[in-house]
Amino acid sequence: MTDADTLVVEFEVRAPVSQAFRVWTERAGLWWPKGHTVSGDPESIVFEPGVGGRIVERGRDGSEHEWGEITAWDAPRQIGFLWVHVFDRSQATRVVLTFAEVGTTTRVRLEQTGFAVLGEAGAVRRERTWNAWGVVTSAFARAAEAEEG
């Protein structure tokens, strides 16, 4: 973590950049931890490609839970999004994921900003979010490394 408004998570994935980006944006429903979803057992998690696309959890009962909106799409190098997830849109933060080639691996940098708008509650949210991203990014790394090219 860096300051009160920002958190940064960096890690390496033993997979090419294009594969890592694809697993994050096209296969999230296969690896995203169920305990970090609205429904607890979604049918799918979709990152609609391109700026303005939605991030949507689709429940097995046909329900949709909008997690956010794509604000930047530079495949396979970067994706940015307004992150609502389980909160009210007025409490949204911004996330930017950058995928950089480092030899035969991919360095992933996740930067999330906007916690300060929540006032005193921002520090608590940031700490919980930091812990949640640890679980989510570990699951992602395992999936990206297991994915067939």
State each model region's role.
Residues 1-42:
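Hydrophobic ligand-binding cavity/cleft-lining segments
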Residues 2-18, 58, 93, 101-109, ...:
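Aromatic-glycine hotspot motif
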Residues 8, 42-43, 58, 121:
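Conserved short-loop catalytic and cofactor-binding motifs
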Residues 13-15, 49, 72:
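Conserved strand-loop elements at the edges of beta-sheets that form or border functional pockets
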Residues 20-21, 55, 70, 79-81, ...:
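Hydrophobic pocket/interface hotspot
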Residues 31-32, 45-46, 56, 60-104, ...:
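Hydrophobic-ligand binding "helix-grip"
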Residues 113-149:
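A conserved amphipathic terminal alpha-helix motif
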